[in-house]
Amino acid sequence: MLRLCIDLNIWVAALLAERLAVCASNRKGRSNTASQYLVELVRSGASPVGEVSLIISLGMLDELRSVIIEHLDLNLDIADAYISAIEEYAKLGVQLTLGGTGVIALRDTEDLHVLETAIAGKADFLVTANFKDFLVRRDTQVKIVNRHAIYHSSAHSLQIVHPYLMVEWLRSGKIPTIA
């Protein structure tokens, strides 16, 4: 089973692409973006390399709800429907966590919470478009600049991956493992 922690920027990008795609008057609508592809894999619980389980926390869901309402200017009903759908995806793999360890040195508390959630949930991959924000100097080994790194801790090791690279790996059926 592939255990994915999807950063909030991926959920937001997928929602925006979907909303643009359904606006008949907007010709800039996008479909089949990397973010949409990843969200669809989580929704279906399956990928070209096997089953998919979502790792997410209640704190991440609360933050996503706030971003949808305050920054995307969408109404509460849309935000709640989106959050409820994500909660259901997480229940498929029973990986809704309460939080993390509190000992990782990241500048941004939201990014810290996401990384801690990925570790607490034993994610194989943390997928984020904000790659550089998750690099912890002494604990992270960069494999491909701005695209792929391995985070090591005593509790768990995981791969931090840009969505484009993650989608490329999934479509090829070749997912690297931590050596």
Residue ranges with predicted function:
Residues 42-101:
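PIN-domain endoribonuclease scaffold, especially VapC-family toxins
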Residues 62-63, 99-106, 165-171:
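A short acidic, often aromatic-flanked loop/helix-cap motif at beta-alpha or helix-coil junctions
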Residues 12-14, 63-65, 134-137:
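Short catalytic/ligand-binding loop motif for oxyanion handling, primarily in non-cytosolic enzymes
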Residues 18-28, 104-105, 136-144:
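Short, flexible/disordered intra-domain loops and linkers
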